[in-house]
């Protein structure tokens, strides 16, 4: 069986390799020396091969050479494919840089991500959870409810490109569909491209952002020069026809909704298991995968084992995605304190608590990378702690954790390396890693989302 690659760069050497294992980001790993045509001076050198899977024999073209390793791209599958190989569902896969694992069976994707988390915990902290929980799985398509899509006008060709960046490149590749984007968004991409192509100011548009709430869709157009009235009216008519909210964002980053009389500048989503509803702006951070998000919040609340009347601290709380469900769990006699750097997001969380009649939830603005020990909210004592930091993790916060007095900590992570680093500090503070799970928030990509439960097991003089 032979399988041709999607592209081939001229004047780059090609070799046959036996693929041995997968890297953390899903590339096949092979070594020089497994085939007679390999250069003798390269024997033993490691090669990372895009699209190749363990057990396969492939022809690969070298794309990058370094002293200790090389990178390559599979151009031909020379024997039987791996049992874990599947047909990619997207016609743009291999050119568009959005997905990197559509050729890998979903079960193997999750297995790989769990191995990544396990490896990082061992390497950085020397620990493993007492129990691995079942992974939280995603839909395999139509799961993304928001996307930023690049726009570039090519004047010599009078052609507008609407699409995503190519793999490891700043070049945009034109797309007419996206298999992981919500179908109500993906199906409108060709019509949206034609609309943007027709605008006089198309050369001044940098990107568009599509976002979907449970019942609304928004279109945000980012432009570096002011659009004329005719262009704005064309965008308005398109949005009215679709029933979408339309927003313009000029170079100064301000956000303006067109036709504000049509309703408030908000989208909405609900977490039905907790009877809470959230309002958010198109620029607010929200989890892109609604199905996984709801399962994640439910699992976090289950792991914390909250009782009525308990006190919970939610760090990096955003618009209250965890805070409001936590407030439901502790009841009217409990208290949830949410802390977030962005004052705008704190106001959004406060408004969301009010709209859900959750008076037991309060929110504070604080840069959590700076000393916050003098603030009153940090010295109240808590039964439980939830941390959902950005990719950089929560290392600066770890020194304050003993002062919170939390018996249980749930750490939600989008970076297994920083989770493992911070886990090592929590262990030093007398916590034990009890449970962990991976969450397939970004299926078909190498991004690893995870959740971990730590419990206090001993008192340590910090």
Swiss-Prot record:
Report the residue ranges that make up the TRAM domain in this protein: 6-76
Q: Which GO terms describe its biological process?
A: rRNA base methylation
InterPro entries with a match to the protein in the record: 23S_rRNA_MeTrfase_RlmD, MeTrfase_TrmA_AS, NA-bd_OB-fold, SAM-dependent_MTases_sf, TRAM_dom, U5_MeTrfase_fam
Spell out the reaction equation it catalyses.
uridine(1939) in 23S rRNA + S-adenosyl-L-methionine = 5-methyluridine(1939) in 23S rRNA + S-adenosyl-L-homocysteine + H(+)
Binding positions for S-adenosyl-L-methionine per the UniProt entry: 287, 316, 321, 340, 367, 388
MF-aspect GO terms:
4 iron, 4 sulfur cluster binding; iron ion binding; RNA binding; rRNA (uridine-C5-)-methyltransferase activity
Q: Which residues bind [4Fe-4S] cluster?
A: 90, 96, 99, 178
Its family remark reads: Belongs to the class I-like SAM-binding methyltransferase superfamily. RNA M5U methyltransferase family. RlmD subfamily.
UniProt name for this protein? 23S rRNA (uracil(1939)-C(5))-methyltransferase RlmD
- Which organism does this record belong to? Acinetobacter baumannii (strain AB0057)
What is this protein's gene name?
A: rlmD
């Amino acid at each position: 069986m032979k399988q041709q690659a999607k592209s081939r760069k001229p004047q780059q050497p090609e070799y046959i390799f036996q693929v041995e294992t997968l890297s953390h980001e899903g590339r096949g790993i092979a070594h020089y020396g497994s085939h007679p045509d390999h250069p003798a001076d390269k024997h033993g050198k490691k090669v990372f091969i895009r699209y190749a899977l363990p057990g396969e024999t492939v022809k690969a073209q070298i794309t990058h050479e370094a002293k200790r390793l090389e990178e390559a791209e599979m151009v031909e599958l020379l024997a039987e494919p791996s049992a874990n190989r599947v047909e990619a569902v997207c016609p743009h896969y291999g050119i568009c840089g959005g997905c990197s694992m559509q050729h890998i069976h979903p079960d193997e994707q999750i297995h790989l991500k769990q191995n990544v988390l396990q490896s990082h915990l061992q390497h950085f902290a020397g620990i493993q959870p007492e129990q691995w929980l079942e992974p939280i799985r995603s839909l395999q398509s139509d799961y993304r409810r928001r996307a930023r899509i690049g726009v570039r006008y090519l004047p010599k060709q009078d052609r507008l490109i609407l699409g995503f960046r190519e793999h490891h490149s700043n070049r945009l590749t034109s797309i007419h569909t996206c298999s992981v984007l919500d179908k109500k968004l993906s199906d409108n991409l060709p019509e949206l491209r034609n609309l943007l192509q027709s605008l006089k100011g198309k050369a001044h548009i940098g990107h568009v952002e599509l976002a979907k709430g449970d019942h609304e869709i928004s279109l945000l157009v980012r432009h570096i020069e002011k659009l004329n009235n005719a262009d704005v009216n064309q965008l308005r008519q398109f949005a009215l026809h679709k029933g979408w909210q339309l927003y313009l964002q000029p170079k100064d980053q301000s956000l303006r909704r067109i036709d504000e009389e049509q309703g408030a500048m908000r989208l909405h989503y609900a977490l039905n298991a907790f009877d809470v509803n959230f309002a958010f702006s198109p620029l607010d951070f929200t989890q892109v995968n609604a199905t996984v998000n709801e399962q994640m919040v439910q699992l976090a609340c289950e792991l914390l084992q909250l009782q009525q009347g308990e006190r919970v601290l939610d760090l990096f709380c955003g618009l209250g995605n965890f805070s409001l469900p936590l407030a439901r769990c502790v009841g009217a006699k409990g208290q949830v304190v949410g802390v977030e750097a962005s004052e705008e997001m704190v106001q959004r969380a406060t408004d969301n608590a009010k709209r859900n009649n959750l008076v037991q939830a309060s929110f504070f603005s604080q840069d959590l990378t700076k000393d916050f020990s003098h603030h009153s909210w940090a010295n109240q004592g808590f039964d439980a702690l939830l941390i959902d930091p950005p990719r950089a993790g929560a290392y600066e916060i770890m020194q304050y954790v003993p002062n919170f007095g939390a018996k249980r900590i749930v750490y939600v992570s989008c970076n297994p390396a920083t989770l493992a680093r911070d886990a090592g500090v929590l262990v030093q503070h007398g916590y034990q890693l009890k449970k962990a799970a991976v969450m397939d928030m970004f299926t078909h990509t190498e991004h690893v989302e995870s959740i971990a439960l730590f419990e206090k097991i001993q008192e340590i003089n910090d």
